[in-house]
Amino acid sequence: VKSVTRKLAIFLGVWLACSPVFAGFEEDYETKQWQELEVQLPAPLRQESLQPFYVSAATENRFFIDLASLTVGADGVVRYALLVLTAEGGRNVTYEGMRCEARERRIYASGRRDGSWSKSRQNEWVKIQDVYGNRHHAALFLEYFCPGGVIVRDVAEARNALRRGEHPDNKRY
């Protein structure tokens, strides 16, 4: 009984001595609140820097990223100017951001005919869904900017994925 009591006393003494060390352990790994960087709108689209990308055989629209506008921010956001040309002759230009970690996207501004930008009134991030109407966002997420849900390392990696037609980490079987 004495040896059990003694061992218990030693255990409790060590546990009490170490508890302040372990108490701070969780604090060391607190997750920080994500903070978005201030966004600078890019220059107007340039024809020579437009890179087409494949979305789906189910759409007649054509999709382009302005490679000159492409950035990978320290805040984990891929930003890019997107041009969508419809089969009927419509033209839609937006400056957008994509958060791979959260699988979200956001429109910062819409492009005007004169090349200027009109800031978006909707500032919230929305989930990227692989549905027909927004398939181009899912394609950018899955095939080019966020392979496996992980953000590309830098602009060069994103540009190379767009030029190749897919990210090299996407395995096709």
Protein language model features and the residues they cover:
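C-terminal partner/receptor-binding element of secreted or periplasmic proteins
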Residues: S118-Y173
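N-terminal signal peptide c-region/cleavage motif recognized by signal peptidases
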Residues: C18-P20
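A short, surface-exposed interaction/processing loop segment used at functional sites
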Residues: A102-I128
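A short, surface-exposed beta-strand/turn
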Residues: T94-E104
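Bacterial N-terminal signal peptides that target proteins for export
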Residues: V1-I10
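Long, low-complexity intrinsically disordered regions enriched in Ser/Thr, Asp/Glu, Pro/Gly
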Residues: F11, F22, R172-Y173
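N-terminal secretory signal peptides
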Residues: G24-Y95
